[in-house]
């Protein structure tokens, strides 16, 4: 039992929506309001577009692409992100970085950048666009399962959205898709 609860969610307190040209006539839901595949919307048997590749987007994409939900899930990203595991050899990733205080951070970043393809953290390996930044110059996305879902075809990768037209969404690569929910 506690006398007080403090929620320290920092800059993530305010839901931000991208401003795409056109109008989407399907359902829209921000991750800020997402609870699970049944609440606040029934997200089963749907054509779903997840926009963004932060940690919340990755977690929601993985959950909604479960075969049991029978969804078609597409992930669209504007700037992309490096996808790193939450754990390496049973240890949290950030604790491994702290074990190398004598190696300059710039050297650590360069070594990781060179090893990115071998480590499987380069999003281009899974059909996503190249990040617009070097590894660790911006917050990476932490997910073990997202690369598996992208690699298996359970999630379809797409570049940024260019415009909306009813239930049709157009992407930078010239393709389009019809979606029930964004």
Where are these regions (language model features)?
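Short secondary-structure boundary/capping segments
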Residues: 89-93
